[in-house]
């Protein structure tokens, strides 16, 4: 296995995400394997959404040999550790993203493009809203429609 990316240094780093993962592994008496850290490091380099297949391809292209089952299992661990979130957008395979500030997903029903937007008004509404006998941890808002690119293509096709 390739080790020139200093995975051992990465695993011992003071990065808050790495620390959170280490704490999760310790709390659950799980092994801290190089493969798990390879997966975590690659995920931390990704901005936005990704599928497990895309993640596997990135790891492979980096020259690491990590089995598909290890990638899937590590993704599940990262979800349990509250580092990743899984999204299953209508009609699409599962996508993942690092947990960040609350945001809305705009999903194009024509091309499948997913765009994230931060809506401070909606966030303020959710933070101020009190639900009877319920404490909100996080929320996901998916808005389905047609992106501007697909709308232009449809308009041109009509003419």
Question: Positions of the model-derived regions?
Answer:
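Non-DNA-binding regulatory cores of transcription-related proteins
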Residues: 81-159
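N-terminal leader segment of winged-helix/HTH proteins
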Residues: 1-29
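Basic amphipathic alpha-helical segments that dock to polyanions
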Residues: 71-81
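Pre-recognition alpha-helix immediately N-terminal to the DNA-recognition helix
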Residues: 37-42
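A short acidic, leucine-rich amphipathic alpha-helix
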Residues: 54-60, 71
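Short amphipathic alpha-helical boundary/capping segments
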Residues: 24-32, 129-133
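Short capping segments at the starts of secondary-structure elements
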Residues: 46-51
């Amino acid at each position: 296995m390739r080790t020139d990316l200093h995975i051992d240094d990465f695993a011992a780093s003071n990065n808050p995400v790495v620390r959170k993962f280490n704490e999760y592994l310790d709390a659950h008496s799980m092994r801290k394997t190089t493969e798990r850290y390879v997966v975590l490091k690659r995920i931390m380099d990704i901005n936005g959404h990704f599928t497990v297949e895309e993640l596997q391809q990135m790891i492979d292209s980096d020259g690491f040999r990590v089995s598909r089952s290890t990638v899937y299992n590590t993704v599940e661990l990262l979800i349990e550790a509250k580092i990743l979130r899984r999204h299953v957008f209508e009609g699409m395979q599962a996508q993942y993203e690092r947990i960040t500030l609350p945001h809305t997903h705009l999903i194009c029903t024509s091309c499948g493009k997913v765009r994230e937007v931060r809506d401070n008004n909606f966030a303020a509404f959710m933070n101020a809203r009190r639900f009877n006998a319920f404490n909100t941890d996080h929320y996901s808002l998916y808005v389905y429609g047609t992106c501007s690119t697909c709308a232009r293509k449809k308009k041109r096709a009509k003419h």
